[in-house]
């Protein structure tokens, strides 16, 4: 894990060093004084960026009981279809849908005047001879309440339905 507070201290010390060199170069009229000013400005920008990153949590939420999934369709907005194993029980399916929602949701997905984010889970079933059918196992619908700016999560589990 990157320690942004340590990076902030290191880049701050370089910024101060280049600031001192910039001031000296301006006073003495060195030819490369504008290069020192540019390096000082860039290192100040890096320092500010690392300082801001110290406040942003970079954690990955793990849902207990979630199984592996594969994204098979993503429209880039509010609909995603994932493929899961057909041997999942109901608790594992719910956990996997919640894990996919945690991994794949971002606020930008709600930008097309739609306040819901839908993840559908499918599995392949070979119950009919040699052809594989896609089973629609369940869906998670994350709905934004525009009055309170909170999300309501609805999970539907389907039994023996096919698409």
UniProtKB/Swiss-Prot annotation:
This is Uncharacterized protein ycf51. InterPro entries: Uncharacterised_Ycf51. GO terms for cellular component: cyanelle. Pfam families: DUF2518 (PF10726). The keyword Plastid applies. Keywords: Cyanelle, Plastid. It is found in: Plastid, Cyanelle. Belongs to the ycf51 family.
């Amino acid at each position: 894990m990157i320690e942004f507070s340590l990076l902030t201290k290191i880049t701050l010390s370089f910024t101060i060093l280049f600031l001192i060199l910039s001031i000296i170069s301006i006073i003495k009229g060195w030819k490369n004084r504008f290069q020192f000013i540019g390096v000082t400005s860039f290192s100040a920008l890096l320092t500010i960026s690392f300082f801001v990153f110290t406040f942003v949590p970079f954690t990955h939420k793990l849902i207990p009981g979630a199984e592996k999934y594969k994204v098979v369709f993503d429209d880039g907005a509010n609909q995603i279809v994932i493929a899961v194993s057909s041997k999942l029980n109901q608790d594992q399916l719910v956990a996997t849908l919640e894990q996919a929602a945690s991994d794949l949701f971002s606020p930008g997905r709600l930008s097309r005047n739609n306040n819901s984010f839908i993840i559908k889970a499918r599995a392949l079933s070979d119950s009919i001879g040699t052809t594989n059918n896609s089973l629609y196992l369940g869906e998670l619908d994350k709905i934004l309440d525009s009055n309170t700016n909170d999300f309501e999560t609805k999970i539907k589990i389907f039994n023996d339905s096919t698409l």
